[in-house]
Design a protein with these regions (language model features):
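Catalytic active-site module of serine/aspartate enzymes centered on a nucleophile-bearing elbow/loop
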Residues: 222-223, 227-255
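Hydrophobic, aromatic-rich cap/lid helix
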Residues: 161-190
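Conserved alpha/beta-hydrolase "nucleophile elbow" surrounding the catalytic nucleophile
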Residues: 38, 98, 102-107
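Conserved HGGG/HGGXW glycine-rich cap/lid loop of the alpha/beta-hydrolase fold
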Residues: 13-68
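Short beta-strand/loop motif that positions the catalytic acidic residue
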Residues: 194, 200-202
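Flexible "cap/lid" loop of the alpha/beta hydrolase fold
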Residues: 108-116, 121-152
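Conserved alpha/beta-hydrolase "acid-adjacent" motif
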Residues: 207-213
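Active-site loop/oxyanion-hole signature of alpha/beta-hydrolase fold enzymes
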Residues: 60-101, 244
Length: 255
């Protein structure tokens, strides 16, 4: 069960930074490391956590400068730095390998992790992903409304977000942490050299759909899943579908 933001207080020091983290589940299960979307903290995984714990031991963490994690005065807010931070956190927690999965903004960190630390991966998950700077967002609200309407028509409801999922300790640091995509190049083509299995998934009503399909097509070991009635931020639109895709991927790979 996910602790509230107020009660979640585990801290690990890695790369000289104090990181807020949570490690849940049975030690015998394969590790799934989840990388947050933009503007949220690790408690926002609550809608899918219980379902995912049936298959995985789950590591969550707040990237530097967000949630309850500290940051470096040198302002090292880059996806490569976030990836190195995750690798260091795994080392301190004695987690040699993980299935690293990022959603939306977090998928950029997951992609960099794969490029820099493939030896620490059992698999890679890229949900709602685009790796181009910047992302075209003009249609995001229209597409989101379409997804909500479709869900309403079939009697499904989106998750009602908790305010605490967006809590963070320092507004200026969080802003810097969540604008790294404006400064980094597209790494899509580099993913084609990966040897590990890669799961790419995106909603039909997500502005990143075409980018996600392009990324999946560029990866020899890539598998693409299309999520119907789903906008950007798929765990909040259809958490059960999101969890089933991730859990089924484990079964297919026999992780």
């Amino acid at each position: 069960m996910s602790l509230s933001y107020e009660k979640s207080n585990k801290i690990v020091t890695a790369n000289g930074i104090k990181f807020h983290y949570a490690l849940d589940g049975e030690a015998s299960k394969p590790v799934l490391a989840l990388v947050n979307m933009a503007s949220i903290n690790l408690t926002a995984w609550e809608p899918v956590l219980t379902s995912l714990l049936r298959s995985y031991r789950i590591l969550r963490f707040d990237i530097r400068g967000t949630g309850k994690s500290a940051w470096d005065k040198d302002d090292k807010f880059t996806f490569s730095q976030y990836a190195d931070d995750l690798a260091a956190i795994m080392d301190v927690l004695q987690l040699p390998k993980a299935f690293v999965l990022g959603v939306a903004y977090g998928a950029r960190t997951a992609a960099q992790f794969a490029l820099r630390h493939e030896d620490k991966l059992t698999a890679l998950g890229l949900f709602d992903v685009a790796l181009t700077p910047p992302v075209e967002q003009s249609q995001q609200k229209v597409l989101a409304a379409q997804a909500r309407q479709l869900l309403d028509e079939v009697g499904e409801s989106m998750i009602v977000a908790k305010k605490s999922w967006r809590f963070y300790e320092n507004r200026d640091a969080a802003l810097k942490a969540h604008t790294a995509h404006q400064h980094e190049p597209d790494s899509s083509e580099m993913l084609g050299n990966l040897k590990i299995p890669v799961l790419v998934a995106c909603g039909r009503q997500d502005m990143n759909l075409h980018a996600a399909q392009r990324i999946a097509n560029a990866i020899p070991n890539g598998k693409f899943k299309l999520m119907e009635m789903t906008g950007h931020g798929s765990p909040f639109y259809r958490p059960e579908l999101f969890a089933s895709i991730v859990n089924n991927f484990k079964s297919e790979l026999k992780l």
